[in-house]
A protein has these predicted regions:
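Glycine-rich flexible loops
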Residues: 2-239
Length: 239
């Protein structure tokens, strides 16, 4: 499956949908990826968050829990959230079929603050997974080019779905905001989705904060993040 196909994309963690085994496996995958990025220094302390899309109708995501060391997560350290990024467990407003899973699996109940933006990205782009880290290069690039980082004629652009030559790719930059509705609106304003002739841009820099990247699944989201970070390093080094 490819990323950025739009809201109709079937990118979900498992065709089985929202089940105990699917949620447990998703939690383990998120914990492993979080440890990877913590080791790189991209998720210092409790910073950063990751998500996996579990279902689309209605939209349900597993998001890493708030306030936990991202290098020490377990498969239970996730929160099930809806299309607004709100917890869907027992007692939550509009709770759905996932009520019992939070209790039976001992899942967390407080999602990361940016869960709302993860949900917005999953809905708008059709992504199956999203990653948000506090990588220094992305922050530096957002400071250097607040209107967006222009990349072209770089080989690694192929890794994020673009041509290595003759194509101008812009990694969008938005201002940081604590209100995820505002930040989500800004994301939609600058999002460059796929067209018949060019691929989407699967990354977003939030100024003075960090970077989001997404993909059809967690592995592709990781590739997009790592490649975008490397491309930003080149842009800064050659300006």
């Amino acid at each position: 499956m490819s990323t950025g196909t739009g809201a109709w994309a079937p990118n979900v963690f498992s065709a089985d949908g929202l089940t105990a085994s699917t949620v447990t496996a998703a939690g383990a995958a998120l914990a492993a990826e979080a440890a990877r990025f913590a080791a790189l220094g991209w998720m210092p302390g409790t910073a950063g968050n990751l998500s996996i899309t579990l279902d689309r109708d209605p939209l349900r995501l597993a998001v890493t829990a708030s306030g936990l060391d991202k290098g020490e997560l377990t498969s239970n350290d996730i929160v099930l959230v809806d299309g607004n990024g709100d917890w869907t467990g027992a007692g939550a407003v509009g709770a759905g079929a996932d009520d019992g899973l939070t209790e039976s699996l001992g899942l967390a109940r407080r999602p990361s603050a940016e869960a709302g933006l993860h949900a917005r990205i999953a809905r708008v782009t059709g992504a199956g997974a999203g990653i948000h880290v506090h990588a220094l290069t992305a922050v530096r690039a957002g400071h250097a080019w607040p209107e967006g980082v222009v990349l072209q004629d770089l080989e690694m652009l192929k890794g994020i779905g673009h041509s290595a030559h003759g194509e101008r790719v812009v990694i969008p930059v938005v201002q940081n905001h604590q209100d995820m509705q505002v930040l989500g609106d800004d994301f939609e304003r600058v999002y460059a989705g796929r067209t018949d002739s060019v691929g989407e841009v699967p990354a977003l820099i939030v100024a003075n904060h960090g970077i989001y990247a997404w993909g059809a699944d967690l592995r592709q989201a990781r590739w997009h993040l790592e490649l975008t970070e490397a491309l930003l390093q080149i842009a800064l080094a050659t300006r």
